[in-house]
Amino acid sequence: MNVLEQQLNHLVDECRPYTAQGKVADYIPELAHVKNDLLGVAICLPDGTYIHAGDVHHKFTIQSVSKALTLCYVLMEFGEDYVFSKVGMEPTGDAFNSIAKLEETVPSKPLNPMINAGALAVTSMILGETAELKIYQFRQFLATLLNRSVEEVTYDEKVARSEYETTDLNRALLYFMRHHGIVEGDVDEIIDVYTKQCAIEIDCFDLARIGRVFAGNGEDPDTGEELIPRRVVRIVKAIMTTCGMYDASGEFAVRVGLPGKSGVSGAILAVGNHELDLNNVGFGIFGPALDSKGNSIAGMKLLELLIERYTSR
């Protein structure tokens, strides 16, 4: 264990008590069973190797972190003009599942792709004759980012079913958007794809590698091959910076200052930048105890302290 990894272990120990101040996402029944005090962090370095601490081998579902990745996928498939004709790019102070801004905005398109309405609109763009084919296309894209076979990128069927059966508000968002011409197709099929997308299983190393791809402007850290076009990376990082942490995005930008995306499983993906001594790196964090805004309470603190101690200025 090197000095940096020792420091990372101390940081996890320092932040783990914060888990007692949060609670797991019990409104999704299958997520309610996760231990509250888990906390782990992996950092993918410029050469593709990792340092890590805590509960990094614990598997969890990607949840809303997938919103940044489906946005990448549809931008690569259809281009920004089409995608942003259906969804905006402005932050909102409302909760991630709010319908309020849809009713107030003309035309009635979601304000950004990181809230549920926007993410559902993005998922509805994925092509395929069936829901399984659509989720396969997304799994294939994710497999490319992770340097794995598509068969190794799986979703938790129990979590997907649990979310599918308790997602009336998302259905309402879709019906509203379909009425206004923002989305097309069968609502239940879109929900099926969306819940399976959110139920894909990953760990801290996977998140950190994806963050490293973003930090390297879309290049594979092992081969240098372009996995995501630089322009798409820039767009998605900008939207993660302004909208990625639900209605705590502004606070996260001030306290941490990195592009990031969280999920209600306790996942946080963050992208290193030039202000860090740890430049050109990706961060993957897992801490299922959430704060009132749906972000990992200990994970947010861990990132804040990590950045505070490793900034170059």
Curated annotation (Swiss-Prot):
Binding annotation for substrate: S64, N116, E163, N170, Y194, Y246, V264
GO molecular function, one term: glutaminase activity
Entries under InterPro entries matching the protein: Beta-lactam/transpept-like, Glutaminase
Enzymatic reactions: L-glutamine + H2O = L-glutamate + NH4(+)
Keyword vocabulary terms for this entry: Hydrolase
Protein EC: 3.5.1.2
Class of the enzyme per the UniProt entry, highest EC level: hydrolase
Keyword Chaperone belongs to the record: no
Gene Ontology BP terms: glutamate biosynthetic process; glutamine catabolic process
Pfam families: Glutaminase
The keyword Hydrolase is annotated on this UniProt entry: yes
The protein's assembly and partners: Homotetramer.
Family statement: Belongs to the glutaminase family.
Protein name: Glutaminase
Organism encoding this protein: Exiguobacterium sp. (strain ATCC BAA-1283 / AT1b)
Gene behind this protein: glsA
